[in-house]
Amino acid sequence: MLKKISIFIFLVSILSSCSGTGSKIKPSITSSNNGSTVLYFTREGGFLAGGILAKIEVDGREIAKLGTKENITHNVSSNYKVKISGAGISGLGIGKDTAAGLDDGKNHFYIISVKQGLFSMGFKINETTESGFKQSQ
């Protein structure tokens, strides 16, 4: 009985780590006329070490875990710092990347991609334009 429970717990943890918190639906981009800064994130296709999710933190607070081709938006009210890393136990040792920006009342667009080397792997974040963001989806 203990063996069945252990297998069940293992399978649940593995399957739940594969599901991202982002959306596959393309976000509607609105012009920022109320002075609020909106961050738009999308993750490109490409798997990393068996489907590791990209954990996005803004100012040290986790806002999403994105799977491939998922999107998320986030509002900020001050200057911000974005950190991208691997999520969960399988994400330990995965390379991290950061970006920073100003609360200037404009929309900011970011594309998260996978970077792999001979002995390394990780996520990379690049700021882009609105048209570049739309083309990446």
Would you name each region that the model predicts?
Residues 1-20:
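Sec-dependent bacterial lipoprotein signal peptides
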